[in-house]
Amino acid sequence: MKMNKKIVSMLVALFLTISALSAVSGDGSDPLDPSDGGADWDGDGLTNAEEQNHGTNMNNADSDGDGLPDGWEVNNGLSPTNGGDANGDPDGDGLTNAQEYAAGTNPNNADTDGDGKNDNVDQYPTDPND
């Protein structure tokens, strides 16, 4: 009878342990766990898991300190770990990436709104009807 109580106690403990482990939510607290990297602690547009993949800091929206959020850099083909990206001009429109970010324009398209005027001379570079 004592052996049965021990077995039952061990099974209950095992059940409680397994239940606790399966209750962990995907809150982004473990960026190395592919099923638990969905949070974006620093609000830069990259999930914690993506931060891990890009080698950026999940607690710093601008890991390289260039004034451009990591997510914006990644989404525009720039490097979130290269502080020199802010001064680049990949589309050749005369605006730096930092200026493109501030204006809300596309650093890879000289005419973001498609109105025939390059962003650097367009008074409303995001309004195709200007």
Residue ranges and their predicted role:
Residues 24-130:
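Extracellular calcium-associated, cysteine-rich motifs in secreted modular proteins
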Residues 1-28:
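Secretory targeting signatures
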